[in-house]
């Protein structure tokens, strides 16, 4: 009877640990997509205001007018 009780408790611990790790993995995936969305930026279309070439979709910012060309 003691051996059966030990086996049952071991099985319960393994099942709980597996379920817990799955839940944490889902949250990790969600966090990584949040981080990725922070890193992606939208570009400014032609005619929009800019300060550098990297802001423009066509990667050309006129320094004279501060607009994307």
From Swiss-Prot:
Q: In which tissues is it expressed?
A: Expressed by the venom duct.
Presence of the UniProt keyword Transmembrane in the record: no
One Pfam assignment: Conotoxin
S-S pairs: 43-57, 50-61, 56-68
Name assigned to this protein: Conotoxin Eb6.20
Q: Which family does it belong to?
A: Belongs to the conotoxin O1 superfamily.
* Superkingdom per UniProt: Eukaryota
What InterPro entries does the record point to?
Conotoxin (IPR004214)
Q: Which parts pass through the membrane? A: none
Question: What GO cellular component entries does it have?
Answer: extracellular region
